[in-house]
């Protein structure tokens, strides 16, 4: 299955934990790649893609293709991967190493856009003697416009829906010792209940919580928005106490009428969560779908195709609280 489940297993390496710093430079650790099937010569490569076919995603969804072998002929492969949309907008690729190509427009997708990923890799040489075998189209739909802005200094998360404030929620972000990344992050996974173990993200035995409710992944290195039933109620809206995640008030087992339960039910894969006023640096562009933190010139510079992408010069994403 070459859909989002396989992709996320590769991106996250199975790690579920609050916080996590990625590699030594703050980027996500290099992602292992799925092993290719045994094939006859010449060896082949596949592209594992996200979002999934037929899915409805948020306006911040970035198309990601992970390759089962390292790509050295990047321009040839990139020309075999295009993204079209209705209504049409220019979409440009950006390489994060030899096994990952992300593609996005200059600004977030408009609600209702139908996006199609065209994989025309059959017979394309990705490296010396290594050829692609895929030829397929994958379409998904962009849903309503929801984005949230976490002000780490004010301990609030403002949820916007179609340009209007939907709700302001009190939060607890990363503690002074374990600060939360700034920048635009994208929800990539949702767990109604999951286990979070500090050893999976570099915190050793500092915590092991078997039933974290309403958890939504923001980075490959382990940043989540999730419910928190173990902190006293006064913490939310007044103090930052987490290991880098964004905590919302919840109850054990998760409750639909809690702040965390409400936000979980309102959110879909591809929604953006932007953190501002944290003392930490901006999240790396390859840590999950962090590519919105590159401006358009920086993004297009990561393409292997030298022709003018013909996209308008534009700011990436919105300033805080706007669209």
Label each PLM-derived region with a short phrase.
Residues 59, 111, 181-182, 269:
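Short, flexible surface segments
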Residues 4-7, 11-14, 19-144, 310-317:
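Acidic, low-complexity Ser/Thr/Gly/Pro-rich repeat segments typical of extracellular/periplasmic
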Residues 121-124, 163, 193, 278-282:
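Short, charged beta-turn/beta-strand-edge "cap" motif at the junction between a beta-strand
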Residues 40-45, 139-141, 146, 164, ...:
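Post-signal peptide N-terminal regions of Sec-secreted extracellular proteins
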Residues 144-145, 198-323:
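Exported/periplasmic cell-wall-interacting domains
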Residues 146-172:
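Compositionally biased low-complexity segments at domain edges in trafficked proteins
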Residues 73-76, 157-159, 194-198, 225-226:
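Short, solvent-exposed loop/turn elements at domain surfaces
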């Amino acid at each position: 299955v070459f859909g989002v489940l396989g992709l996320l297993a590769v991106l996250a390496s199975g790690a579920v934990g609050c916080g996590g710093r990625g590699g030594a430079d703050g980027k996500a650790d290099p992602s292992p790649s799925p092993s290719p099937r045994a094939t006859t010569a010449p060896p082949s490569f596949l592209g594992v893609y996200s979002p999934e076919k037929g899915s409805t995603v948020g306006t911040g969804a970035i198309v990601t293709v992970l390759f089962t072998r390292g790509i050295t002929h990047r321009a040839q492969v990139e020309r075999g991967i295009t993204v079209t949309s209705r209504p049409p907008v220019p979409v440009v690729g950006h390489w994060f190493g030899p096994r990952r190509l992300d593609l996005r427009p200059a600004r977030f997708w408009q609600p209702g856009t139908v996006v199609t990923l065209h994989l025309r890799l059959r017979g394309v040489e990705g490296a010396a003697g290594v050829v692609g075998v895929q030829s397929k189209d994958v379409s998904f739909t962009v849903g309503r416009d929801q984005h949230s802005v976490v002000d780490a200094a004010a301990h609030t998360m403002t949820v916007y829906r179609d340009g209007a404030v939907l709700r302001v929620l009190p939060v607890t972000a990363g503690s002074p010792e374990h600060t939360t990344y700034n920048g635009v992050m994208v929800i990539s996974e949702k767990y109604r209940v999951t286990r979070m173990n500090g050893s999976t993200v570099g915190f050793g035995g500092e915590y092991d919580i078997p039933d974290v409710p309403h958890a939504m992944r923001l980075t490959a290195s382990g940043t989540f928005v999730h419910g928190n039933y173990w902190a006293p109620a006064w913490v939310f809206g007044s103090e930052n106490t987490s290991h880098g995640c964004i905590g919302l008030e919840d109850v054990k087992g998760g409750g639909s009428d809690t702040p965390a339960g409400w936000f979980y039910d309102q959110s879909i894969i591809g929604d953006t969560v932007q953190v501002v006023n944290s003392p930490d640096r901006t999240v790396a562009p390859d840590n999950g779908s962090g590519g919105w933190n590159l401006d358009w010139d920086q993004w297009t510079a990561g393409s292997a195709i030298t022709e003018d992408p013909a996209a308008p010069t534009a700011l990436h994403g919105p300033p805080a609280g706007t669209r």
